[in-house]
Amino acid sequence: MAWRQLKKRAQDAMVILGGGGLLFASYLTATGDEHFYAELLMPSLQRLLDPETAHRLAVRFTSLGLLPRTTFQDSDMLEVRVLGHKFRNPVGIAAGFDKHGEAVDGLYKMGFGFVEIGSVTPEPQEGNPRPRVFRLPEDQAIINRYGFNSHGLSVVEHRLRARQQTQARLTEDGLPLGINLGKNKTSVDAASDYAEGVRVLGPLADYLVVNVSSPNTAGLRSLQGKAELRRLLTKVLQERDALKVAHKPAVLVKIAPDLTAQDKEDIASVVRELGIDGLIVTNSTVSRPASLQGALRSEPGGLSGKPLRDLSTQTIREMYALTQGRVPIVGVGGVSSGQDALEKIRAGASLVQLYTALTYRGPPVVGGVKRELEALLKEQGFARVTDAIGADHRR
């Protein structure tokens, strides 16, 4: 009898402890505890789910508003005015997370100062065969070869038009929307693909991105060559200028980190010559640093995350110098902390983006980056984030 009572009490205790643990974990999930997400929840999810399934679920949960809202309140010192718009804070989500414009509002609630969707291609396409996304947890990195999988312009246009008035209010409130454009795999005239993207989605964007730097579409990076780039961007600008909208979107070009010195000079020359509004620096890299530890490090595709950080920052530094600081730069590649963000800003970026860090640290990383950035700005004597833009070039 005594044994049965003891066993029953033990079972009751386990239920109470288990239920309490579940409630506590639920509380930490809902409140967006940074350490809980980075050290327990995200690693556990990665053990359970393959990378692409995890990505799809993350987009779905974000679209349904099932992820924690940010608790960080943006201060005035984080505000940036660039590309013809106010940005409440300089930390955005890079293209690649919300490829089809399904989760825009949820991403703003996560605390991002701007959202960039895409890449969007004119016609729907499946992209490359699976598996096409690979984690390198030892390196805090991802290799992907998605290959511009896209729902196509028509579907994305319909999706964005349904929330057009909502976006207009968000933009006015300092939360702009960017749309990243790509070309179809089988297209023979890339310029026509990008021009069509401008015609269809330009009226719905605060800025457009001409993505000529993905390593996962054959021949795409050749569009970064001087003559090809000039021809392409001339056509894109003509289409943008012809849009019948009150506020025409800015046009930015997203470039690769794997460029020669001559490539960078040529891009800077064309951008300045044509009056391109900005650069996004950089896309993922095809290089594989010797420091990589992940078992899947040799998989083909673009490498993003921590191993890209310094290469991206150096490319920002060079492009800022080549454009004399007159072309706004969005810095992306390996941002997972306020220190990473500030290094890119000091190198010349007006805004920064992250993505891979979100897969390893979860939604709380957004508030963490902003909080750390604000503290570092104060520590280094900057009254506003805009005072830090290009600071390394003024030493």
Curated annotation (Swiss-Prot):
PROSITE patterns: DHODEHASE_1 (PS00911), DHODEHASE_2 (PS00912). Monomer. Keywords: Flavoprotein, FMN, Membrane, Mitochondrion, Mitochondrion inner membrane, Oxidoreductase, Pyrimidine biosynthesis, Transit peptide, Transmembrane, Transmembrane helix. It catalyses: (S)-dihydroorotate + a quinone = orotate + a quinol. Coiled coil: none annotated. This is Dihydroorotate dehydrogenase (quinone), mitochondrial. Pathway: Pyrimidine metabolism; UMP biosynthesis via de novo pathway; orotate from (S)-dihydroorotate (quinone route): step 1/1. Binds 1 FMN per subunit. CDD domains: DHOD_2_like (cd04738). The gene is DHODH. Its EC number is 1.3.5.2. GO terms for biological process: 'de novo' pyrimidine nucleobase biosynthetic process; 'de novo' UMP biosynthetic process; pyrimidine ribonucleotide biosynthetic process. GO terms for cellular component: mitochondrial inner membrane. It comes from the Eukaryota.
